[in-house]
């Protein structure tokens, strides 16, 4: 957030290096042996769940070559800075090559993970383990069938909410910051342990 623009290249190099080192640690054969040994232990439900999820991560990590992990991390960092510039200039074409490269690297990742019917199955499994496109499509089709007519009916209804309070104009960055600080303080945010800055896109993170 506070990094000067010319620090982008160094950041991308550092992110690539750290991702490479993390991948080496995660894919160490010793990690696999430790996970296998834990599966035969008398674990609590919570411990068993932890072992299961780490095993999933280990399995996926070992399918990816180190070079791809490094390239993805470097590109992600570089693309973020280009996106920030393109957003400020309202120029999508400036970001388009980076987005295309992101899709290309994501497809490579999916190929390494492997799939049976649809390339998206490999990516969907990251967030919804076991889910496939063939299972998901009927679900969304059913939702569309029910929701689209509902939204249309709501939009055409004579009983519309009063939204005039939304049409009061733009808010200055200073006023937005002032409001955000008050909200943070009201929920007990500790400014001795954290800070609030202005960024291209809102987010919250911690360490």
Regions from the PLM with identified roles:
Residues 1-129:
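A well-structured
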Residues 72-207:
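Contiguous, non-catalytic segments that form substrate-binding/exosite surfaces or channel walls
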């Amino acid at each position: 957030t506070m990094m000067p623009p010319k620090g982008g290249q160094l950041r991308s190099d550092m992110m690539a290096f750290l991702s490479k080192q993390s991948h080496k640690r995660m894919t160490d054969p010793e990690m696999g042996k430790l996970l296998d040994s834990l599966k035969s232990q008398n674990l609590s439900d919570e411990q068993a769940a932890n072992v299961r999820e780490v095993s999933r991560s280990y399995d996926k990590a070992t399918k990816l070559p180190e070079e791809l992990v490094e390239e993805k991390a470097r590109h992600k960092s570089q693309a973020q800075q280009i996106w920030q510039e393109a957003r400020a200039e309202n120029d999508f074409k400036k970001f388009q090559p980076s987005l295309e490269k992101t899709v290309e690297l994501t497809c490579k990742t999916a190929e390494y993970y492997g799939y049976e019917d649809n390339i998206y199955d490999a990516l969907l499994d990251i967030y919804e383990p076991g889910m496939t496109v063939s299972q998901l499509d009927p679900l969304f089709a059913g939702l569309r069938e029910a929701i689209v007519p509902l939204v249309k009916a709501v939009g055409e209804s004579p009983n519309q909410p009063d939204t005039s309070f939304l049409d009061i104009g733009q808010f200055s960055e200073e006023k937005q910051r002032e409001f955000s600080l008050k909200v943070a303080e009201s929920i007990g945010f500790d400014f001795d342990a954290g800070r609030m800055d202005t960024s291209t896109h809102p987010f919250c993170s911690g360490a």
